[in-house]
């Protein structure tokens, strides 16, 4: 693990505005009721000393919260904090702008830098690793020797062939070959006053860091070692099928909660995105490929905020297309040429069938 989010010891190092962070604390107290200082620090994923204690002091000074009692902890972190009437009004104003009340986000610039430092480009598989990962599958040596360069190229891969021949199994095996490391992703991303929720418990699997249980002392150790706004996960392997549409490839804005959900390809950064049953989506294959052309070639993606502003994110994803349909029935030759590696997973030969 080469990348480790540097620890935060001052508010300035978060890259976030102090008033924005104070509003986040008020929203959490509004939703959850009175909490200890240490618990507030745990919820917003920032260290108590030097960051959360400063926020709480400022809020006390403005009479937006008050100290109820001590919960037997050491210092201010053990005190129980409660929101005041004025604090409730301020929290409601903040909630009209955004109802996000989770871990403090990481600025987009920091996220993009982290993606580059944890890039898949440096990952390589050997013939031995491939044979180990594919040992449960039977196919020709020709197919085997085409898969290796495709995986190591970190370019798009197009798997095609009749149904039941193992295309999805091959894609999953690719994941077991190259997604063995862990990476850090932020719980959420901050850009232009907007929050994009990044961590997704369905698509992201947490990779333990030594402390299996989240105790107060464990949180303090994590805060001392690295920025707790980041979560360590296994490199993602995300599958999307017929439900995929063009809207799902851009930021999804929740009109009620007033924050965004990251699209599939952003959640898959640092890993693999498998487009299963390609050609059976709710969008034409040519339109879908058109959406990928710039990201696939430039390793940069452009997403649109509801304000109309476009933001730039790193595109570090191995895209694998899998289809039962003949490639030429899906898109024209010009589009197919843009897909670097086209590999047919054909019917087994007589000898392979006997081995199966």
Predicted regions, residues:
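Dynamic helix-loop-helix/coil hinge segments at AAA+ ATPase domain boundaries and subdomain interfaces
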Residues: 116-144
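Short amphipathic alpha-helical elements of helix-turn-helix/winged-helix folds
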Residues: 24-32
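A short helix-turn-beta junction within AAA+ P-loop NTPase domains corresponding to the substrate/partner-engaging
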Residues: 331-347
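Conserved AAA+ ATPase "sensor/coupling" helix adjacent to the nucleotide-binding pocket
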Residues: 294-295, 338, 355-356
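Short alpha-helical segments that sit at the start of domains
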Residues: 2-25
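Short acidic, hydrophobic short linear motifs in intrinsically disordered regions
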Residues: 31-46
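Conserved ASCE/P-loop NTPase catalytic core
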Residues: 135-320
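Interdomain "pre-motor" coupling segment immediately N-terminal to P-loop NTPase/helicase cores
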Residues: 53-123
């Amino acid at each position: 693990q080469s990348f480790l989010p540097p620890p935060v010891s001052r508010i300035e190092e978060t890259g976030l505005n102090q008033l924005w962070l104070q509003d986040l604390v008020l929203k959490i107290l509004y939703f959850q009721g009175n909490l200890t200082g240490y618990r507030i620090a745990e919820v917003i994923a920032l260290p108590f000393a030097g960051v959360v204690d400063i926020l709480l002091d400022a809020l006390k000074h403005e009479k937006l919260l008050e100290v109820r009692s001590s919960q037997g902890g050491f210092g201010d972190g053990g005190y129980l904090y409660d929101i005041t009437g004025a604090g409730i009004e301020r929290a409601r104003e903040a909630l009209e702008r955004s109802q996000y009340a989770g871990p403090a986000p990481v600025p987009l610039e920091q996220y993009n830098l982290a993606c580059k430092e944890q890039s898949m480009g440096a990952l390589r598989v050997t013939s031995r690793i491939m044979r180990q990962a594919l040992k449960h599958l039977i196919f020709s040596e020709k197919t085997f020797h085409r898969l290796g360069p495709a995986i190591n190229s970190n370019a798009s891969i197009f798997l095609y062939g009749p149904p039941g021949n193992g295309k999805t199994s091959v894609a999953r095996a690719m994941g077991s070959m190259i997604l063995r490391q862990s990476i850090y992703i932020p719980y959420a991303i901050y850009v232009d006053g907007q929050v994009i929720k990044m961590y997704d418990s369905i698509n992201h699997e947490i990779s333990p860091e030594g402390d299996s249980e989240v105790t107060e002392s464990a949180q303090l150790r994590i805060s001392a070692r690295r920025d707790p706004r980041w979560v360590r996960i296994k490199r993602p392997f995300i599958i999307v099928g017929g439900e995929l549409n063009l809207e799902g490839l851009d930021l999804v804005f929740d009109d009620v909660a007033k924050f965004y959900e990251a699209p599939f390809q952003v959640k898959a950064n640092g890993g693999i995105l498998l487009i299963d049953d390609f050609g059976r989506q709710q969008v034409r294959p040519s339109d879908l490929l058109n959406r990928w052309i710039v990201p696939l070639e430039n390793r940069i993606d452009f997403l649109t905020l509801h304000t109309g502003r476009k933001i730039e994110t790193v595109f570090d994803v191995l895209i694998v297309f899998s289809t039962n349909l003949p490639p030429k029935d899906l898109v024209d030759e010009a589009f197919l040429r843009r897909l670097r590696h086209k590999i047919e997973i054909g019917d087994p030969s007589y000898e392979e069938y006997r081995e199966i």
